Structure formats: C-alpha cells, structure tokens
Amino acid sequence: MSEVLVRTNEAPRLRVFQRLGELWRDREILANLARKELRVKYKSSALGVAWSMLNPALYLVVFYVVFTYFLPSGIEDFPVYLLSGLVPWTLFTTGLQGATTSVVGGSNLVPKVAFPHEMLPLAAIRAQLVNFFFQLVVLVAFLLIFGYPLFHRGIVLVPLALAVLLVFVTALGFATSALNVRYRDTGHLVDLALLAWFWSTPIVYPASLVQENLEGAFSLYLLNPVANIVLAFQRGIYGGVSRQALESLPAPGLTWYGMRLLVVGVASLVLLYFSWRLFYRRSGDFAEEL
C-alpha cells in the first residue's frame, strides 16, 4: 500500500510567553544590535551623539522664530510647550522609521545568523530611545536655565506616557518592518503618513484651539493615539509652568490624561499582539525575500 504525504502550509503560531522568554534569553543580542545602530549612525561624525541633542535645539529655534514673529501662536511660554511635544514626537517618528527599515537593513544577518528576528525592529527603537533621553536632557536643561518648575504633580504622567508610546511604536514597527520586506514602498508610505500625522498632533499649536473651534470634531481628533500621548507629555511638563499654560491644555486635571493613556495603552497592546503575529508569520520568509 502506498503512503500519501499531505503537506500543510500552516503558518507558525505565535506563543507569546514562550517567545518573550526567548527574547529575554537573547537580550544581549538586542543590546549589541542597538549599539551597532548608534555606531553606524554616528560613524565618522565629529559631534557623535551630540547631534541627537542639537536636532531638537535647532527645531526649537526655527519653530520659535516662525511661531513668535511670523505666525504668532499665542501660546504662553511657547518654547517649553514646543519641546514637551517635540521630544516624544521625535522618538515616535525616528523609532517607527528605523523599525520599518530594520529587517531590510539587516539583510546580511537574517539568512546567516539564527536569532529572533523581532530583535531588529526592537533594536532600532531602543537606539532611538537612547537619543530620546539625550533630548530629554536638553529639555530639562532648558527648564532649569530659564527657571521653569521641573517637579510638580503632573510629572507622573511622563513615564506613563513614555511606556504607552513605546508599546504603540513597537506595534506599528512590527507591522511596517514585516511589510517592508516584501513591499519596499512601505518606508516611503510611512514617511508620507508621518508628515500628515505631525500636523494632526498638537505640537506647534494647542489642542485647545481644536477644542474651541471644532468642538464637535474634538472627539474624532482624539482618536489619534499620538495626540493623546503628546498631550500627556505636555500636561506633565508644560502644564506645571504656570496657570496660563495649564489653561491652554484641554483639561487641567490629571485624571483626564490618565484615562486617555489607559485607553490608548490597551488599544496599543491589542495592536501589538496582532502586528506581532503578522511579523512572526512573515519572518519565516524573510531570508528568501531578502
């Protein structure tokens, strides 16, 4: 009697806790990849990581001149407002862009070295997290030099908002990095999306402006997860500057921002699960497609 072989093309199933254990076991690989990312970025650069601090400083000067002298924003203590939104936004954009191209950029490793491929987008985000802390130093130095209060009740929102931001950018990064292996236009689409995303996020204008002029659409405006995260950063940093600063934000109390972060955090975890599944399913074909 002849035997019949039946082949199945069933995709590998993601077992989250088992995979987390594997990632934790190989965490040194993640650290090495992140260090490599930073070394490559600042290779042959005279200023090195100082560029990560100069970038937000340059943005501050440009936006300050534009929105103070040419298009007055009317925002009290505008430099603090700008930096408190620009620093987390920069982490989001650079983290997502780096994650999107990470697997293609690691094409010399994927076919030759056995390691969890999730390490590539995670390392890209971790490298940008290092830059984020350097930029945070610029913000703290600015606050101290010009005598702005640094510690107040709202500061507790900053680490919470950072945690939610990291989950959200990781969720998006898993999806875009996996898609970019097969569809190389993904990176360009991400860049275009980020341009529109910037102007739909309250960084150079106050969210209260949207709240006052488009009251009916404000709830739709808050469907933007990054807007909620940036608002929490602004409440945690800018909201302690003065009473006038607090009045330019959508709500004075911390509870409103905490609830927004909770909603975005839960949604980001759900998105992370499904984008991770997508990445895991496609990772088996990376070596062939690269």
Regions found by a protein language model. Give the residues of each.
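Hydrophobic transmembrane alpha-helices and immediately adjacent juxtamembrane helices
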Residues: 1-290
